[in-house]
Amino acid sequence: MSLDLNEIYVDNAATTPVTEEVLNEMLPYFTKSYGNPSGLYMLSQESKAAIEFARDKVAKVINSQSSEIIFTSGGTESNNLALKGFCKSDIIDDQDEIIISSIEHHAIIHPAEQLTSIGYKIRYCNVDENGLIKVNEFEKLINER
């Protein structure tokens, strides 16, 4: 599908086009240097080196350690990693509560629902007519859990 110049795409929460700069940077990895970065062969090592270079670049931009940068395949994987990873860490207790919006994407709702099987409770915060969190309601949902 391609957009007519007179059309406006409004589902940018689902997918967005990449900028030409990003496309040009990624094109070699779609066409020539596409080796599995976990492999031991030369093409794999080239891919692994490119990923490590990108990881270092991102880390510098956000003033982080490269070991803290994790690349995922997309939004759903990122959401799962963030939510489940945080909940399964030692930072919080498995009896704690998770607050999500009432219009949350399934990529958050489904993993949150899975976490209820190990003791987490989901609390939903409603949104206003513009899809924005109702701050007063959100503040009431916050507690020691």
Regions inferred by a protein language model and the residue ranges of each:
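Pyridoxal 5′-phosphate
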Residues: 1-145
